[in-house]
């Protein structure tokens, strides 16, 4: 799929808000435009400049790299549920594509290293550190030593370090966050109601009758929440069936779609029939389109001016 260049536009409305020392923060980076504490009106104006008027039907399925740190400050005041849901998907769609690309690069590094290892190459000390760090990250353990150790670690890493379809990430976020309206995502940027046990860090359950031994995890950004959730899917024993089924699809050289994995998500939520809810949400909102979509890239103004 071809990449599309998005010239970097900033709406006058958005720049004015930032320059007026408002809470709104605009961060221009080589990979995209990062926005913090924007209002719905500011965000929709910015989307309009990029032709991003709906979460689907973008030309060539290429999406502008506009990444929100948090949901708009007045997001929960949108009274029209249909409009609110569509804007929610517009917001998290680029984040899911960004994470998919990041996981794809991480997987490529693991696969290339394992391929060289299987051909007889010895790992350098730097490569050994890389493997050990990934093993800790993805909760992989073995008591074996030497070359046998890295054979086991790399094999297990190749199963775990893999993409999570954007449609699956988006549907799960919509369901768990009540389409971006619940307290957990508004106060803690937590899209998936992830829990932390026996700690004072995080958001307390509001109902005093609930178990007080846990907290809802909080995150610096929506993207950090999505990364944490994807890591859970790729590392926890509860999702081994999902990972094995994903590997089987890839072995047959087929694309991995969110709907293909939805039925394996039986232990992902306290909600009844969560797997069915995932399948329905992906289907009804046509989120499978995101599984084959790509992010465009921006050209910064100073680079454009030099040409």
PLM regions and their residue ranges:
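Bacterial N-terminal signal peptides
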Residues: 8-16
């Amino acid at each position: 799929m071809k990449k599309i260049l998005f010239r970097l536009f900033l709406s006058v409305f958005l720049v004015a808000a930032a320059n007026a020392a408002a809470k709104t923060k605009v961060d221009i980076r080589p990979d995209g435009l990062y926005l913090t504490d924007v209002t719905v009106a500011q965000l929709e104006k910015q989307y309009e400049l990029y032709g991003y008027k709906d979460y689907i039907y973008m030309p060539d399925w290429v999406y502008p790299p506009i990444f929100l740190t948090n949901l708009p400050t007045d997001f929960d005041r949108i009274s029209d549920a249909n409009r609110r849901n569509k804007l929610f998907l517009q917001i998290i769609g680029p984040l899911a594509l960004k994470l998919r690309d990041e996981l794809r690069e991480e997987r490529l590094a693991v696969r290339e290293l394992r391929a060289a290892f299987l051909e007889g190459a010895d790992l350098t000390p730097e490569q050994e550190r890389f493997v050990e760090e990934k093993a800790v990250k993805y909760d992989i353990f073995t008591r074996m030593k030497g070359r046998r150790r890295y054979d086991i670690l790399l094999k297990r890493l190749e199963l775990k370090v893999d993409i999570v379809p954007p449609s699956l990430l988006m549907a799960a976020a919509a369901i768990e966050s009540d389409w971006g309206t619940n307290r957990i995502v508004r106060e803690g940027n937590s899209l998936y109601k992830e829990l932390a046990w026996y700690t004072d860090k995080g958001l307390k359950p509001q109902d005093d009758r609930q178990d007080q031994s846990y907290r809802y995890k909080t995150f610096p950004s929506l993207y950090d929440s999505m990364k944490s959730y994807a890591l859970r899917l790729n590392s926890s024993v509860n999702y081994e069936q999902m990972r094995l089924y994903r590997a089987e699809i890839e072995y047959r050289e087929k694309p991995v779609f969110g709907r293909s994995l939805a039925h394996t998500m039986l232990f992902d939520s306290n909600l009844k029939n969560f797997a069915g809810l995932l399948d329905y949400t992906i289907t009804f909102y046509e989120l499978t389109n995101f599984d084959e979509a790509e992010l465009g890239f921006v050209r910064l103004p100073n680079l454009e001016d030099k040409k």
